Each structure stands twice: as structure tokens, then as C-alpha cells.
């Protein structure tokens, strides 16, 4: 069975990790990536979670943004488009590494843990556009703790071109694998 370059669908290659830290933090008034939780910054905590689970880890930043504190050693993907938002970061990473699936997490998820990520990876379905958790609050997809498969890029590009730039809305209109928390 061949599908998008994978020879054995039961063992897809590990995804790249993408830590989204390019937001402007307008509501918070300061860069979210500088906030400390349990003595360390959010990007440091998130990068540590991704380290043993991903082939490579990348930090997504907006154009002109300096690297986040504590993760200066990560590869950086700068937004390739003027438009803001997490979809731009995801598409920028997918454009730089089109063959890779991406485990995408936001930098401001202080309660994200290894069990949650391990379950997401164990349940991953590479034949779907994405594997995501379903929100326990409203049942909708949680797009910022999701594995986006490499073949999702063209679908995401199409939504972007049609001015649909909210990853949650995109997942609601496609058929990702949704996991219960």
C-alpha cells in the first residue's frame, strides 16, 4: 500500500514539531512567549515536550520577531505571508518542508503534558488531513494541538486563498480524526 510516500501506513514517519510563538499578544499586552510558568517560559516547556516525539522541532515566528527566550537553539520558520494568525505559521512550515507532517502546538498551553501528546501520536491517522482533540467544552476541534499531515497543505492553501484562515473552522469543514480528551 502506498499513500503519499509512506510505504507502511501503520508506521508513518515521525512528524516535525512546530511551536507557534508568532502571535502579537495584543489582548495580553506582552509577548506570551516570555511568560513564566513553574519557573520556565512556555516555549521552553513546549519544546521539551516536542523533543523526544518529533523528527525536528521548529519555532514559528512572525516577520521581524526576535527568538523566544529559552529556545534560541530551535530552527526558526518565519511567516512567509503578511496576514497574521496561526494558519500562516503552519503554511510557512509546510512550504519549507512539504514532505513532513507537523505536530503543531501553541506556545501558551501550560497544562499540555506528555500523556496528551503521546496519545495524539499513538492515535494518529496519516490518511486523514489531521489528527486533533475534540474540545471538552464545545465538541469542536482543537487546532493548536494537532498533527497536520503533509497532504493537508494543498487543502489549507485552498482555504487560505478563499479567505478562511481559522484553523478550527478549516478542521470543522474537513474530515480530521477527532479524539476525545
Show which residues each predicted segment covers.
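Nucleotide and nucleotide-moiety/phosphate-recognizing core
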Residues: 10-167, 172-181
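N-terminal amphipathic/basic-hydrophobic helices that include classical n-h-c signal peptides
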Residues: 1-8
Amino acid at each position: 500500500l502506498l499513500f503519499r510516500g509512506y510505504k507502511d501506513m501503520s508506521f508513518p514517519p515521525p512528524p516535525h514539531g512546530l511551536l507557534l510563538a508568532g502571535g502579537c499578544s495584543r489582548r495580553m499586552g506582552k509577548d506570551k512567549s516570555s511568560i513564566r510558568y513553574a519557573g520556565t517560559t512556555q516555549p521552553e516547556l513546549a519544546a521539551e515536550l516536542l523533543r523526544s516525539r518529533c523528527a525536528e522541532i521548529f519555532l514559528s515566528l512572525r516577520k521581524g520577531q526576535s527568538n523566544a527566550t529559552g529556545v534560541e537553539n530551535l530552527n526558526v520558520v518565519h511567516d512567509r505571508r503578511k496576514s497574521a494568525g496561526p494558519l500562516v505559521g503552519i503554511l510557512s512550515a509546510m512550504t519549507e518542508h512539504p514532505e513532513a507532517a507537523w505536530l503543531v502546538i501553541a506556545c501558551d498551553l501550560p497544562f499540555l503534558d506528555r500523556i496528551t501528546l503521546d496519545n495524539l501520536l499513538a492515535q494518529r491517522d496519516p490518511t486523514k488531513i489531521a489528527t486533533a482533540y475534540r474540545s471538552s467544552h464545545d465538541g469542536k476541534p482543537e487546532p493548536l494541538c494537532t498533527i497536520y499531515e503533509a497532504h493537508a497543505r494543498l487543502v489549507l492553501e485552498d482555504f487560505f486563498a478563499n479567505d478562511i484562515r481559522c484553523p478550527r473552522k478549516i478542521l470543522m469543514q474537513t474530515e480530521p480524526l477527532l479524539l476525545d480528551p
